[in-house]
């Protein structure tokens, strides 16, 4: 990347988006933010670009930046809504077959962060995820349903947890997102141990 001339990168803004995501995955956050500034400069230098294309570029930039806000649902949601408003097509930097949970077997363990705030976090997931699904072709489908079912399980509401689990299984059926299936399977296993379900 260091050997690629800046002017070449500026001529290929979609490549900048993919590189931003790669830098995030490699934990090269300063380089990721440097690429973001390059993308913004490139968009500003090209007023002739169609507004739809600019919206897609800037919206996807917001989507990628949202990962820096993990696991703050409110902060991530602001960027997802911004991306959703600007984008007219699905993101190119995120494949819906890729992992959504970064290997975690639990959505709740990923996003519940403050004691006493679980209801608010669940509501934020319900509000946030449709925007995220819209711009990622359903990547992580069922996350909010799984999180709510896990919350019901932890509250001892085993029947509600089982119903939520079945809803989640139905939501993710056939979408190829194994990581979401594993979250469901993990909850099903816990229910079989603690709730009398098999």
Labelled PLM ranges:
Residues 187-190, 198:
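Long, low-complexity regulatory tails in eukaryotic proteins
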Residues 16, 195-198:
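Repeat-solenoid scaffold signature
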